[in-house]
């Protein structure tokens, strides 16, 4: 979710109309920080309500789960992913599509995206399992993480 809050703030600063929809009001320390920054940009936020129709949105950022997700999507997250998939919007997934396992690319219900932006590194799950049929175009966003060889050389 933290990636989504950063993206929302950057888009708002660029003059793009943004709305954050939360599945719950529970944040990690980093998530709370970046959510507060997004809200400071004047971005409205609301809690997900079952049955919400997302068909009026042009673009949706899928930032529900990241590469550490394993298991089955349930509850509000499952409802939100179904709505994303029915929206007809251009869907951008951060790191990996919500619902896909970052190691295996397997998953039941998952977000189907037009574009998946890997943050820092590609994950094995981008190329395995169901991933090739649901990730859309895949690009990597270099965030300046040094390759292991350079880190070891620095030590």
Residue ranges and their predicted role:
Residues 1-63, 72-94:
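Nucleotide and nucleotide-moiety/phosphate-recognizing core
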Residues 57-155:
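YjeF_N-associated NAD(P)HX repair module
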């Amino acid at each position: 979710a933290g990636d989504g809050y950063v993206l929302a703030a950057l888009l708002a600063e660029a003059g793009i109309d943004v709305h954050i929809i939360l599945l719950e009001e529970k944040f990690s320390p980093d998530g709370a920080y970046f959510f507060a920054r997004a809200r400071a940009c004047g971005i409205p936020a609301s809690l997900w309500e079952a049955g919400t129709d997302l068909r009026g949105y042009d673009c949706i950022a899928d930032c529900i789960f990241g590469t550490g997700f394993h298991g089955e999507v349930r509850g509000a997250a499952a409802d939100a992913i179904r709505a994303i998939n029915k929206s007809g919007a251009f869907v951008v997934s951060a790191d990996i599509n919500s619902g896909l396992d970052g190691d295996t690319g397997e998953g039941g219900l998952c977000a189907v995206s037009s574009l998946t932006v890997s943050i820092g590194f590609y994950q094995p799950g981008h190329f395995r399992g169901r991933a090739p049929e649901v990730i859309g175009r895949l690009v990597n966003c270099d965030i300046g993480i040094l390759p292991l060889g350079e880190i070891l050389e620095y030590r």
